[in-house]
Amino acid sequence: MLLPFREHLDFGPTPYDLLLQKEGIPIVRGNVVDDVTTLELGKWERMGVLGCYLNLSNQQRTDAYVCEIPPSSQTLPQRHVFEEIVYVAKGRGATSVWQDEKSKVTFEWGPGAIFAIPLNSTYIHFNGSGSEPIRLFVGTTCPAMINIFHNEDFIFRNPFNFRDRFHEGDEFLRYNKHVTDRYWETNLVPDVNHFPLDDFPMKGKNVKHMRYTLGDTTYGCHVSEFPPGCRSTFHRHGPGAVIIITQGEGYVVLWRDGEERQRHEFKVGTVYSPNDLMWHGHFNTGKGNMRHFAMRGDSPKYSHDRFRNPAWTMIPMADEDPAIQREYVEILKRNGVEAAVQVVED
């Protein structure tokens, strides 16, 4: 018997909801954003740039935002007791991060880079281009921290330095450790589309995957690669996942028990986020590999999950509606892709 989805409860605005209202920038809701590089943004006083929140799936533990740094500009210095993982959706720039002036580290990045801000470190993002803006897609644990402490002084003006999470000097960029299959610890990945992933044969032929602990965060993330003609099984989990397409094309199918399936096309720059316990499956319809970058759950280094019941979290292909597979095969044929479909048990 499958675990039913949880009912929505509303006891009024949470501390995080109130923070979003106070920030005064647009808030995008729903499940899917077509392209983060074209979203309408607003003036963000705290950051000193343009931005919008992506409060997809009404998340209250993790969330995301998009910020745009104009040419020859920079963000205001930021410091906060919540974690951030940054994906560079557009442009080239640099980030300075420090706990004190002696420990300041500056590194450059370009499209497709991912990195984390060490907890409660001060940082500034820079745009060195005189003509092109930068867009950053950022996942955060802000909702959980604000909802627990509901005190902005503690979150944004806390002097404590987490020295165990900060690699000073050259060590910040030198720190790279391939811990085991499909798991890497580092502070910066220059380009998720060119970073070598490990084979994941139990997920499907030619499927590749890598989980990361970035910047010693507890916030989890991973990159998955689906070859042509490849799709995932339908799976579900708790709220908080945000997924951005970094390479290729296809679609995602979303639904909850008792509701109709929704199909959403995706391309590079599309972001989607399933609701709590919402079934979802990823489908590659292109002639090349499809990669996505997902932020959700705990990082491998600090995961405290100890139990999982696959019967509650995945639908074997033999048990799904046959129309799903037939539709996929027909789309592949129209696109000139071999219809020998590989199914990824995700």
Residue positions per predicted region:
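A short, N-terminal "cap"/entry segment at the start of jelly-roll beta-barrel domains
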Residues: 1-60, 151-218, 222, 322-346
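Conserved short histidine dyad/triad with adjacent acidic residue
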Residues: 46-52, 63-80, 205, 222-237
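Short histidine-centered beta-strand/loop micro-motifs
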Residues: 53-56, 74-80, 97, 106-107, ...
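A structural feature that tracks compact, well-ordered secondary-structure segments
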Residues: 64-69, 126-128, 221-225, 231-232, ...
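Glycine- and acidic-residue-biased ligand/ion/polar-headgroup-sensing regions
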Residues: 70-71, 80-100, 227-228, 237-257
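Histidine-centered metal-chelating micro-motifs
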Residues: 74-76, 94-95, 113-125, 231-232, ...
